Amino acid sequence: MVMTDPIADFLTRIRNANQAKHEVLEVPASNIKKGIAEILKREGFVKNVEVIEDDKQGIIRVFLKYGQNGERVITNLKRISKPGLRVYSKREDIPKVLNGLGIAIISTSEGLLTDKEARQKNVGGEVIAYVW
């Protein structure tokens, strides 16, 4: 089966595992998925990220994070720029997610950045997803 949007698939797998309260999620690796997973780790949405190398493309193991009473840290993830409709943002128009409570993941010339990092570096780019 040919996958037309591997990023949407990755976000959907995280959303589904989070809803089912799974501890660990494994997905096929790619550079952009590694970047998104690292941003989620850096921003405190997931506990840890491991990249398992094999002879093929590799696997990303994501350890999901929950609060003390089992409440979800990730409320939702939303794919913004899709293969059929790309969404770009100038550096002046970088979106804020829930007035700063969430993050926007943006693909820039500096690599994958959050909305705050893109504003600090004064760069725009393709808005990949919102996470809150």
Swiss-Prot record:
Gene Ontology molecular function terms on file: rRNA binding; structural constituent of ribosome
InterPro entries noted in UniProt: Ribosomal_uS8, Ribosomal_uS8_CS, Ribosomal_uS8_sf
Database matches in PROSITE patterns: RIBOSOMAL_S8
GO biological process: translation
UniProtKB keywords: Ribonucleoprotein, Ribosomal protein, RNA-binding, rRNA-binding
Superkingdom of source: Bacteria
Gene3D superfamilies: 3.30.1370.30, 3.30.1490.10
GO cellular component, one term: ribosome
Keyword rRNA-binding tagged: yes
Keyword rRNA-binding: yes
Record family assignment: Belongs to the universal ribosomal protein uS8 family.
Functional description taken from the UniProt entry: One of the primary rRNA binding proteins, it binds directly to 16S rRNA central domain where it helps coordinate assembly of the platform of the 30S subunit.
Record protein name field: Small ribosomal subunit protein uS8
Species annotation: Streptococcus thermophilus (strain ATCC BAA-250 / LMG 18311)
Top-level taxonomy: Bacteria, Bacillati, Bacillota, Bacilli, Lactobacillales
Gene designation: rpsH
